Swiss-Prot record:
Listed name of the protein: ATP synthase subunit a
Record's function text: Key component of the proton channel; it plays a direct role in the translocation of protons across the membrane.
Pfam families assigned to the protein according to its UniProt record, in alphabetical order: ATP-synt_A
Stated family: Belongs to the ATPase A chain family.
GO cellular component: plasma membrane; proton-transporting ATP synthase complex
Quaternary organization: F-type ATPases have 2 components, CF(1) - the catalytic core - and CF(0) - the membrane proton channel. CF(1) has five subunits: alpha(3), beta(3), gamma(1), delta(1), epsilon(1). CF(0) has three main subunits: a(1), b(2) and c(9-12). The alpha and beta chains form an alternating ring which encloses part of the gamma chain. CF(1) is attached to CF(0) by a central stalk formed by the gamma and epsilon chains, while a peripheral stalk is formed by the delta and b chains.
Length: 281
């Protein structure tokens, strides 16, 4: 009966512990290990059959967007020459991405027009990652592949459009195939590899890099958190302390990874944009 109850609610990882409060080691119940079921959610509204529903990740994505817009609106709605604390924090974040990522990768003159896109991507990705360690939410939206895929698609379309606009069809062809006549007889093979790398592998890896890191990080956090509770019985208590310490350590590490992955995502975005504007020789 206990196993059936756990299976019934396992779609929501935030409910695992709540429905297994009397399940500890040596009690005869199995360890409620995290898995793919930890990333599946029942609709908060609607149903899966109709493909029209609203679930927890969607809610977090919406709330995250509102938080970001609200933060910058509050910081810049009445900008001051001598900035207050909120404006100072917002300016520091904005300026870090503008100067440290966009200007350094694309250049000041060409990059200025892409600052809004890159800043928006950075803070959105970062916020979606941060949900993983925020109480009650405790789920990184970017651990669901659809979200990184859409963001990567936006960058991909921007890159293709910009390449066509700046270099024309011939320039686009040379750009995506890495055309270099000095390669001689291996040129056809090199062009084929480069074509698949740019057209298929590039957007795939751009999305999967973010998704895989958030998926793995959340799984580890769930594992140590659940283990801390599960081991609270008999001699297992000693190991529960170790698991709890690992939960704290992994949370701190995950906080670093969340910011790093947001940074890497926009850094690659700027690299692709810069490559689209660079004339291929």
């Amino acid at each position: 009966m206990r196993h059936a109850e756990g299976a019934a609610v396992s779609a929501d990882p935030t409910q695992v512990l709540a429905f297994e409060t009397d399940c500890h080691i040596f009690d005869g119940c199995g360890f409620p290990s995290p898995g793919l079921h930890s990333f599946l959610f029942e609709p908060l509204w609607g149903d899966h059959d109709s493909n029209l529903y609203f679930n927890k990740p969607m809610l977090l994505a919406l709330l995250g967007s509102i938080v970001i817009v609200g933060f910058f609106w509050a910081a810049f709605r009445k900008p001051k020459v001598v900035p207050g604390k909120l404006q100072m924090v917002a300016e520091a974040g904005y300026d870090f991405i503008r100067r440290g990522v966009v200007y350094e990768t694309i250049g000041k003159k060409e990059g200025e027009k892409y600052v809004p896109l890159v800043v928006s991507l950075f803070f959105f990705v970062w916020m979606m990652n941060l949900w993983s360690i925020i109480p009650v939410a405790q789920f990184p939206v970017t651990s669901i592949i659809a979200y990184p895929a859409v963001l990567a698609a936006i960058v991909y379309v921007t890159w293709i459009t910009l390449t066509f606009k700046r270099q024309g069809f011939v320039g686009f062809f040379k750009n995506v195939t890495g055309y270099d006549k000095s390669l001689g007889p291996v040129l056809p093979l090199a062009m084929l590899i480069e074509f698949f790398s740019n057209i298929l592998i590039r957007p795939f890896t751009h999305a999967v890099r973010l998704f895989a890191n958030m998926f793995a990080g959340h799984t580890l956090l769930l594992l140590f958190t659940i283990a801390s509770w599960y081991l609270l019985n008999g001699v297992g208590i000693a190991y529960a302390g170790v698991s709890f310490i690992m939960t704290v350590v992994m949370t701190a590490f995950e906080l670093f990874i969340q910011a790093l992955q947001a940074y890497v995502f926009v850094l690659l975005t700027c690299t692709y944009i810069q490559g689209a504007m660079a004339e291929h020789h």
